[in-house]
Amino acid sequence: AVVTGDVQTQNDADRLARHTERLVQAVVTNGACHLDARQVNEALDAIDLEATDLLFIENVGNLVCPASWDLGEQAKVVLFSVTEGEDKPAKYPKMFREARVAVLTKLDLLPYVPFDVDRAVAEARRVNSGLEFIFTSALADGGLAEWFAFIRRTAGAVRV
């Protein structure tokens, strides 16, 4: 199941729902820059947790506010792409400090954008030396095995 967070729309939830039979529950924050535990708890009312093996919570899409809120998640995951610049960890240190894994996306664009992967990793590890990295490329199917392995490993340590 998936709980999505969005400031004004449920567009992300609608897009996901078109591609899965699993329940996708939208939380619209009406201007707030993050989800909070109460909102997630209310969204869970619509989900049959007994029949759910895995729950993803997609917080509102910024790297500032969501870092400060405990939603009961097993692990915080931060996604950033090569198109955003390797200085993201320096600009948003709290998110990278709180994250257990960073997923670097759009690696297939490296030939076309100025991005130094080693610098990005070094910047992130300055604020979180134990941060795990997964490198992905949707066009080349790169990194998905590592992502799935992380999910299996993390889901095996269920927090009740």
Regions found by a protein language model. Give the residues of each.
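Structural signal for conserved beta-strand scaffold positions within catalytic alpha/beta enzyme cores
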Residues: 26-28, 78, 135
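Conserved Rossmann-like nucleotide-binding pocket used by diverse enzymes
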Residues: 3, 103, 134
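Nucleotide-state-sensitive switch-loop elements of NTP-binding domains
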Residues: 1-73, 85-87, 96
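Conserved NTP-handling cores and scaffolds of large molecular machines
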Residues: 11, 20, 44-47, 67, ...
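Short acidic active-site motifs
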Residues: 12, 91, 143
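Canonical P-loop GTPase G-domain recognition
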Residues: 109-160
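Conserved C-terminal guanine-recognition region of P-loop GTPase G domains, centered on the G4
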Residues: 62-131
